[in-house]
Amino acid sequence: MPNNQLNFPNIQMSYETENQLFSNFVPFLSLKTHLAIQRKNQQNAIEWLVKEFQIAETNLDVLPTQADYQTLIAIQVYQQLFIQHKDCIYIRGIDYCTTWQIQQLLLKLKQISRHYHKQIIILTHNLTLLNYHE
């Protein structure tokens, strides 16, 4: 599923190099824990995404433990773009995901990009994945 078929004008993949330091990383594997800690600050983002992605569980206290990782990443991207007004978001850690999980994440990010036109860069060490989405 190449980028151009999904029509992601603001979403791209980039090769992740060692020692990249950015203040606006969205860490993939620790996001569930991060959301549980920061839940009160992200309630608006969670409510928006519950509606936008039609998440069945609407109890905000349990959503961070029940939602899939792709939705949790989308919540964090939304929170940083809309609430913290960052110009660019970097997502890392997708090398541990299956192709299906990555496609689901891209679809969720596409929904966000319809509402906001900021750069979202997905970092990867996987050259095959990188070439596939160019």
Where are the predicted features?
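Conserved catalytic loops of ABC-family nucleotide-binding domains
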Residues: 84-88, 96-130
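A short helix-turn-beta junction within AAA+ P-loop NTPase domains corresponding to the substrate/partner-engaging
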Residues: 132-134
